[in-house]
Amino acid sequence: RPKVGIVQAVREHGVPFVSKIMSAGLEGWQKKGIPLSIADEYAQAGDKAEKRRELGERFPKCESIINFLCCCNSEGEPRPDIQLVINSSKYMLDFIRECPPDFQISAQCCDCCKKQPAYNVQKDYEMIITGERRDEGGMRSVPRKDNTALCFTETSDGQYRFRPLYYVTDRDKAWYKERFGIRYSDAYEIYGLTRTGCCGCPVSYKAADDLELIRPYEPNVVKAAWNIFGKSYEYRRKYNAYKKARMAEEKKKKANVDGQMELFDFIEE
């Protein structure tokens, strides 16, 4: 069992928002108090490498946070399309500016309640066998430093890691279920969920919607999830609405080309 429960972890550290990477970046920004305006300074700088160096001197020991906010690497090179920057979620920087969070953001509840207990259990074993599958996506589909082969490897500390299900596809899994008449948990078979993780975790983009699916069966669970993660659910809804409005605005601007005349612009004689 974890030394710290989910409720205490969230109270002490904060609530996840959008993704673990986004949560870590925003947690650092909140703790360090770095102004969002550094992103504008970097964007407007002619010499971005020099500006990045200057920001590093102005805000020491904040390298990852500077890179996160400015969407760049430590050399000052723009990196707008990688997962480690704030705008990996479209318009997130502008949204945070216009609607700053009134709660602490963090994904450390995952470390406290899942990762640390797992590490404590597995540290004395020679081999660690886990059930990750590549088709689950996310970090599980990306090669890791200790596991370039993905299915089997030896780590730097002498342990072996084995993922026997890694190359089992969703199609394989469906065949196996039908062939052997396997019944999934009620979460899938009755409640209608497509994938589960920590109950109510806001990292899932449809966490709040999934809670409504299980409300008729688990009303107390739904109530508890809202008490723990509710601020993140509401903030996610605000962000989704903001993103939708911005995308519609951009689409409208692209349709209206400056200088282009329409049929109704011509004066009838």
Segments the model singles out, each with a brief description of its role:
Residues R1-R179:
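ATP-dependent adenylation/nucleotidyltransferase module used to activate substrates
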Residues G158, D170-E269:
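ATP/NTP-dependent adenylation/nucleotidyl-transfer catalytic domains that generate, transfer
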